[in-house]
């Protein structure tokens, strides 16, 4: 549904990490961290990233031992745990545990920045909306992180309607990002909005037409590089509507595309892996 964006999320987490640690790192260390994120984004071997990322996760946990009051560090650690759980952890129990840890970290950062939002799951959509009206461009990294981590937590509990009931709150966070800074992360808010709006069929409250438009907008704002948007459209629109021609057309286009694009290579390789799996299972599904 909403995961598989590890490369982009790692880059975003590194920006948060550098902001939090500006007084702790030398210029050389900051440069190395940026270069590490760039290397990951442009890596075309997801398995290599899968094997290397745990060291980065452990480093973030170590930094939080003495700096748990720094929202940027909490957000960076939350992003990494969530993205790794969604993209690389096959054991559902372990993935759920990592996503729960990530959500706790994200909510802790939200509480530090905005004490009135310490328990967002307990607020109604109207209460949450009212509490976010004062937020501005400086809050976009916070909103994006809480939204993506929360979405990842829901994704791993898709069979739990109590978890799925949180989707309107996640949508509200992403909509607020679009209102403040629509080009954040090259259209990422539209990717998440589209994934949320196409998750359910119209009969159950889904917004298929709106979701398709949002996924198309995500592709447009990425200059055509975002292959994951097409995978989501195939999985959540074409399959829901039992539209085999649309399904195969989208996925074959993803598989045939050159995944190599600066800042998009890893995510596109993950999208192609997912596209191949969906194509392989298509005969059984349809």
Predicted regions and their residues:
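Alpha-helical adaptor scaffolds
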Residues: 182-223
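Bacterial N-terminal signal peptides that target proteins for export
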Residues: 1-10
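N-terminal alpha-helical interaction modules that lie
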Residues: 22-187, 200, 221-224, 239-286
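Short conserved catalytic/interaction loops centered on acidic-Pro-aromatic/His motifs
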Residues: 206-207, 225-231, 244
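Alpha-helical protein-protein interaction modules
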Residues: 212, 231, 235-240, 244
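C-terminal motif of bacterial Sec signal peptides marking the signal peptidase cleavage site
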Residues: 17-20
């Amino acid at each position: 549904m909403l995961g598989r964006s590890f490369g982009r999320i790692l880059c975003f987490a590194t920006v948060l990490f550098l902001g939090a640690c500006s007084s702790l790192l030398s210029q050389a260390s900051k440069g190395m961290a940026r270069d590490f994120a760039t290397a990951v984004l442009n890596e075309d071997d997801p398995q290599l990233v899968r094997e290397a990322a745990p060291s980065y996760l452990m480093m973030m946990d170590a930094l939080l031992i003495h700096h748990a009051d720094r929202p940027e560090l909490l957000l960076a650690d939350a992003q990494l745990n969530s993205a790794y759980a969604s993209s690389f952890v096959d054991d559902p129990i372990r993935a759920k545990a990592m996503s729960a840890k990530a959500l706790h970290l994200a909510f802790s950062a939200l509480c530090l920045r905005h004490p009135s939002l310490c328990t967002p799951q307990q607020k109604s959509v109207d209460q949450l909306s009212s509490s976010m009206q004062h937020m501005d461009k400086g809050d976009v990294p916070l909103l994006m992180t809480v939204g993506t981590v929360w979405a990842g937590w829901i994704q791993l509990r898709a069979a739990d309607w109590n978890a799925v009931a949180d989707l309107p709150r996640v949508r509200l966070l992403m909509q607020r990002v679009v209102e403040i800074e629509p080009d954040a992360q090259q259209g990422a808010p539209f990717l998440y909005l589209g994934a949320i709006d196409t998750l359910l069929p119209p009969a159950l409250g889904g917004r298929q037409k709106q979701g398709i438009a949002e996924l198309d907008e995500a592709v447009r704002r990425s200059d055509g590089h975002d292959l994951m948007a097409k995978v989501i459209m195939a999985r959540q629109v074409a399959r829901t509507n039992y539209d085999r021609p649309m399904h195969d057309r989208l996925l074959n286009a993803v598989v045939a595309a050159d995944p190599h694009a600066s800042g998009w290579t890893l995510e596109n390789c993950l999208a192609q892996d997912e596209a191949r799996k969906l194509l392989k299972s298509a005969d059984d599904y349809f």
